[in-house]
Swiss-Prot record:
Protein name: Aspartyl/glutamyl-tRNA(Asn/Gln) amidotransferase subunit B
Catalytic activity, EC: 6.3.5.-
Matches recorded under PROSITE patterns: GATB
Organism: Ehrlichia ruminantium (strain Gardel)
The family this protein is said to belong to: Belongs to the GatB/GatE family. GatB subfamily.
SUPFAM superfamilies, sorted: GatB/YqeY motif, Glutamine synthetase/guanido kinase
SMART domains on file: GatB_Yqey (SM00845)
Purpose: Allows the formation of correctly charged Asn-tRNA(Asn) or Gln-tRNA(Gln) through the transamidation of misacylated Asp-tRNA(Asn) or Glu-tRNA(Gln) in organisms which lack either or both of asparaginyl-tRNA or glutaminyl-tRNA synthetases. The reaction takes place in the presence of glutamine and ATP through an activated phospho-Asp-tRNA(Asn) or phospho-Glu-tRNA(Gln).
Keywords linked to the UniProt accession: ATP-binding, Ligase, Nucleotide-binding, Protein biosynthesis
Length: 481
């Protein structure tokens, strides 16, 4: 809980979130038009139904139902055997029919939860998950408004939480956790920049210790977690200031101005009766039987929290590494391929530290990396069988990442095989000790830290190729003579 210090009393935030998650599907919710619209030219992925041409009827995409059921199960929801679609009536230029098909009365899933482990295992209740159409997109340029209907009719899952959140830290954790789950089960790509994971935040404040809910404002269409946090912080503090000045709050719908960092009113908040909901007469209700729910449940992959716990339990990974590896489904798959051949801690170290450092620097995903799982396995093979040292492996990896070449070919091309010949290493050690007689004497007089100096000089002479264990062994032997 985050307390807002007021002049008259302390206040707490009451926050509920409505997340609009675009369903991963080839086609739209009620038409055959492509749902892959982000990079398309305006109004090129549009059917007659999407733009409300007279006589066009909706045809339900059953795959979207499966995706919504899968999401509900992953969020511990009750999947309702009966579900139905309704019309939400309002006028806006990017909504050509004058209504949105949604699920107001009978949503597809209810009573779920998301557990926030970093907030003392707090449970944030999921009120409902329902399917609905996305609207088109209004583009305002040069004093004119243009409408792109590509997005109109794309399937959305609206995931509504109870007002259980009490700080922006909890909000950020909730959104990250929810997005991770949806990505992992393959129902939403969670790309906020592209608008496929958007958030409306309902914000109110009340005196600390009160159980009465205050007048809330809804901040619409927030498309980054950073903006969600900034908008909520600003709005909550604005409400506290108004209440302490004796002002009466009005239920409003707001937008967040990311340049000014402040919220502004776009309209008074509507209630349900303002939208005149009624059952859509063109669509049958849904009967979702238990057998179907069981089949969808069987298709669920291992969830990230379960996978993380398994990594910690079975592979003895620390929580930090395990959390990173399960944050993305493709990263987890990469790790699991490597760990079939190599020690889990060794694999995790190379993926989390070395591979991720380079991926993050370039801002690319693991699927775009030149170092595939098979290449990583080969590199670790060379380390384990002592063909190369760990230090040389870093050089090999850097070349792999830049060139896409295999580690074996790089080792051969650059002559990087580890020097394992004891006679050759012994000669180099003798030369190093001969050239540093004063330091040898100091070592024998008790300055044992110089041992590392001798090792470093040998490695320098061999350009890092000498087997470190062999070098250590021979130096110890020579110093005892």
């Amino acid at each position: 809980m985050k307390i807002i210090k007021g002049k008259k009393c302390d206040w707490e935030m009451i926050i509920g979130l409505e997340v609009h998650a675009q369903v991963i599907s080839n086609s739209k919710l009620f038409s055959g038009a492509s749902a892959k619209t982000y990079d398309s030219l305006p109004n090129t992925q549009v059917s007659l139904f999407d733009v409300a041409m007279p006589g066009m009827l909706p045809l339900l995409n059953q795959y979207c139902i499966s995706q919504a059921v899968k999401t509900g199960l992953a969020l511990s929801c009750k999947i309702n055997n009966y579900s139905a679609f309704d019309r939400k009536n309002y006028f806006y230029p990017d909504l050509p029919s004058g209504y949105q098909i949604t699920q107001f009365y009978y949503p597809i899933a209810t009573d779920g939860k998301v557990v926030l482990e970093e907030s003392n295992d707090k449970e944030v209740r999921i009120t409902r998950i329902h399917l609905e159409q996305d609207a088109g997109k209004s583009i305002h340029e040069y004093g004119k408004t243009y409408v792109d209907f590509n997005r109109a009719g794309v399937a959305l899952m609206e995931i509504v939480s109870e007002p259980d959140l009490r700080s922006t830290d909890e909000v950020a954790e909730y959104l990250k956790k929810l997005r991770m789950i949806l990505r992992f089960i393959g129902t939403c790509d969670g790309d906020m920049e592209k608008g496929s994971f958007r958030c409306d935040a309902n914000v109110s404040v009340r005196p600390l210790g009160s159980d009465k809910l205050g007048i809330r404002s809804e901040i619409k269409n927030l498309n980054s977690i950073r903006y969600v946090v900034q908008a909520i912080e600003y709005e909550a503090n604005k409400q506290v200031m108004a209440l302490e000045n004796g002002e009466e709050l009005i239920q409003n719908t707001l937008l967040f101005d990311v340049i000014l960092g402040e919220t502004r009113v776009i309209r008074n908040k509507e209630d349900a009766h303002d939208y005149r909901y009624f059952p859509d007469p063109d669509l049958f209700s849904l009967e979702i039987d238990d057998q179907y729910i069981s089949e969808v449940k069987l298709s669920l992959p291992e969830l990230p929290m379960q996978k993380r716990d398994r990594y910690i339990r079975d592979f003895k990974l620390n929580k930090y590494d395990a959390d990173i590896l399960v944050a993305d489904r493709d990263v987890a798959a990469y790790f699991e391929e490597v760990v079939q051949k190599h020690d889990a801690k060794l694999a995790a170290s190379w993926i989390v530290c070395d591979l991720f450092a380079r991926l993050n620097k370039l801002g690319i995903s693991i699927n775009e990396s030149a170092v595939k799982a098979g290449d990583m396995i080969q590199l670790l093979d060379l380390i384990v069988d002592k063909t190369i040292s760990g230090k040389i492996a870093k050089q090999v990896f850097a070349i792999m990442f830049e060139s896409g070449k295999s580690p074996i070919s790089i080792v051969n091309e650059y002559g990087l095989k580890q020097l394992d010949d004891s006679d050759s290493v012994s000669m180099i050690v003798e030369n190093v000790l001969e050239n540093n007689k004063d330091k040898v004497l100091q070592y024998k007089q008790g300055k044992e830290k110089l041992f590392g100096y001798f090792v470093g000089q040998v490695m320098k002479e061999t350009q890092g190729k000498a087997n470190p264990e062999l070098v250590n062994s021979i130096i110890k032997e020579k110093l005892q003579e």
